[in-house]
Amino acid sequence: MVVFAVLITITVVTSRASIYTGISGELASIAEFNGGEIQSGFDTVERAALGIQDYIGRLYSGQVTEEGDADLQQSTLYPGRALTSAAYNLEQFVVETARNTVKNTPEIKMLGVMFEPYQLQSDMEEYGFYVTMDTADTSIHIYDAYEGYAKEDSYRIPAGEGHPYISQPYQDGDGMVVAYGTPITYGGRVVGVVITSVD
């Protein structure tokens, strides 16, 4: 009897240790995989921000030629708002960059581009929008006021401190996401921020 009790105890302890090791290993693998996906999303957003930053630099240094700068064009996102050719071309570039990034990167649920007051154009205090994975082909969501995006940590911290921001994971719908914001700089100052939610 005592022998059976000892064998049962040894079996239970050994089984428990094996199960614990197996579960720990599986959870570590899942965490490593998820971490890799999140890092991939961050890298994609960094590339998008650097592409926008590079375009702004080329635009304002004259490397991107602007025909008809005196002609104002209607904003695609803000109906009734007239944009200079430079601002219009920048709008087209950032909208397509955001759309394509969301459509081609499954781990990115949302991507937005927001500018500091009067940085897209000298008579526009606010300019910000975001694209979601679900509506990338059909609609773009705009912010009507600077305050609408300026208070969000993913904008406020990169804009104010000049470095990327990563939130703690939070529940969004049926999954966990991480918010990420990275500054767009020109001439040594922050002119805007690219933000995203990474699955």
Per-segment meaning from a language model:
Residues 39, 57, 98-106:
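Short regulatory alpha-helical segment in sensory/regulatory domains of signaling proteins that mediates
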Residues 81-88, 101-163, 168-175:
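Extracellular/periplasmic ligand-sensing ectodomains of membrane signal-transduction proteins
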Residues 3-88:
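Juxtamembrane extracytoplasmic/periplasmic/luminal helical "stalk" adjacent to the first N-terminal
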Residues 94-103, 193, 197-199:
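Solvent-exposed, extracytoplasmic
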Residues 39, 148-152, 181, 197:
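Amphipathic alpha-helical bundle/coiled-coil segments
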Residues 174-199:
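Conserved beta-strands of PAS-like sensory domains
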Residues 28, 46, 95-99, 152-155, ...:
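Extracytoplasmic/secreted envelope proteins and their assembly/folding machinery
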